[in-house]
Amino acid sequence: MPAENSFDIVSDFDQQELVNAVDQTLREVQTRYDLKDAGVTITLTKTELIIEADSEMSLRSVRDVLETKALRRKLSLKIFDYGKPTDASGGRVRQVVTLRRGIDSELAKKLSKMIRDRFPKVQPRIQGDSLRVAGKSRDELQAVIAFLREREGEIPVPLQMTNYR
């Protein structure tokens, strides 16, 4: 039996599921009566999503459809960081949606402090855009996981626990 057990806390999402959600959103937008003539375009890159429509109301409707499709595909809505709608050419409206991936250093420090204060027997370590929590007792690590699941509403990014050993 290993002397120390550990798990990683990461914040990531399935890129293919996001592609599928965007495709389904475009398909629904093209068939919906209220959005059919809105000229909606959605451009997806690795780090952002650009939604363009003819009015702010259409933009909000597309956003609602996108969120519904993302939830059905088991994607957290916390991955979307919506920017302010801006005017685009031709009287259109554009909104840039930044996709959140990884745990930034400020949040990693906050999570590390939360874990250390509550569980003195485990050692959280920041590793780039993830956090490794190590401890001797598996029960203690499972308690940390349960604690983080309870606090999920306070954390601005979706968390996944991986590499539990």
From Swiss-Prot:
Pfam families linked: DUF520
Gene Ontology CC entries for this record: cytosol
Keyword annotations from UniProtKB, A to Z: Nucleotide-binding
GO MF: nucleotide binding
Top-level division of the source organism's lineage: Bacteria
Coiled-coil regions, chain positions: none
CDD domains from the UniProt entry: YajQ_like
Keyword Nucleotide-binding: yes
Function: Nucleotide-binding protein.
Family matches, as HAMAP family: YajQ
Matches recorded under PANTHER family: UPF0234 PROTEIN YAJQ (PTHR30476:SF0)
Family: Belongs to the YajQ family.
Protein name: Nucleotide-binding protein Caur_1852
Species this chain originates from: Chloroflexus aurantiacus (strain ATCC 29366 / DSM 635 / J-10-fl)
Lineage: Bacteria, Bacillati, Chloroflexota, Chloroflexia, Chloroflexales
